[in-house]
Amino acid sequence: MIKKLGFRNILRNRRRSIITCMIMGLGLAALIFADAFLHGLNQNMITSVTDSFIGDGQIHRKDFLRTRELEKSINDSENVFKKISEDPKIKLAVPRTIANGMIASPTDVLPIALYGINAIEEEKISSIKNSIKLGSYLDNSDPIQLLIGDKLAKFLGVTIGDKVVITMAQAQTGILSQEMFRVSGIFKMKNKEMDSSLAFININKSQEMMGIGNNFHEIVFKFKNKSDVLNPPSELLKLYSENDNEALSWKKLVPAIDAGIQLTSYSLYIGSFILFAIIALSTMNTLFMSLYERMYEFGIMKAIGTRPLFIFKLIIMEACVLAFFSSLLGISVGGIATIVTKWIGISHLTDVEYLGTTIKTAIRPIPSLTQYIVYPIAIFITAILSSIYPAITAARIIPSKSMRRD
């Protein structure tokens, strides 16, 4: 009985009911799409950071990232590398050496961060090889090959095949070490800092120049499970943070990205609160308008003995009917929008720098089951809560006053 009356009362003024359903439904659709888009944006940023160069995590000597002292190579480097390479949670690990130095061409001298890498292993964990725009990638058999960024090449006035001189101080002794290299490749990683200040050579040559033997300054690793990327296991990081070494996840290495992801979550919460407030006011407004149009009707119902609880339930049911059709509309529109944009991809933000990283691929919204369960349930709860006041008002109607014709 209550269901039939509630449904009929909603259809009594179809235009108002349709407008209210559209407000609630399109609001729900916007919320579903925004949630999926932000999940896709966050995943895109994480992938851009971890797959480009940083990896899912890194191991260094304590304070190395702050001081960049050549002497601060990883303690027991080879054993640590072997141990993490065999760890069941680790998909891949590669070593690197890092040194600050100067690079000189016939036209200019500039400071650089020089990385020594194993060319074969490095291409499995970073996008250096895929970022080569001119020339070729490093060959482990050629010790004088050099990779530099396109902006650095422009500053130095060099191109493929040109020779440059790199100078650095050796570990322990501080004696200057100078070597001539040939530019074999020019990369563009779409990051201003990397493209203007990084250079790569073969790791064996870098160890020789730095005078650090078989040691290295950095071990970059990737997790096997995607869940570990989003929530790095603290036990694993603690395991490799021994003997004056330090294992850090990408969240600690690039805190701006992690903060940005948290900020997008807070933004979604604030947006959701505002949206649900609008939905609540719209529902309350619709129910009150319907209530005042039917004051005479409710007065008659009270006069013939209808209980206040019945009228209270009737108004609540009307709100539930509105929420039901609004949820169907919101789920349909939000789902279609998410599926279409996931298939097409949002490429307008490609190559845009955000929080220190560059969005390199099209953003694809990521749908989840919670978007289609939690948000519709929230719509129902909001509709029910916002209908309580109109329902109480209707239940307390005094027949003699409501039936009066002035």
Predicted regions and their residues:
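Hydrophobic secondary-structure segments that place a key small or acidic residue at a functional site
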Residues: T97, L110-I117, I132-N204
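Internal alpha-helical transmembrane segments of multipass membrane proteins
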Residues: M22-M24, S265-T286, F324, L329, ...
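Hydrophobic, regular-secondary-structure patches
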Residues: D35-A113, S136-D142, K238
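C-terminal membrane-exit region of the final transmembrane helix in multipass inner-membrane proteins
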Residues: N13, R364-D406
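Transmembrane alpha-helical interface segments in multi-pass membrane proteins
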Residues: F288, Y296-K342, T382
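N-terminal Sec/SRP start-transfer signal
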Residues: M1-I32, N42, S48-D51, L309, ...
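Mechanotransmission and gating elements of multispan inner-membrane complexes involved in transport
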Residues: Q170-L268
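Short helix-loop junctions at transmembrane helix boundaries
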Residues: K313, L328-V374, I388
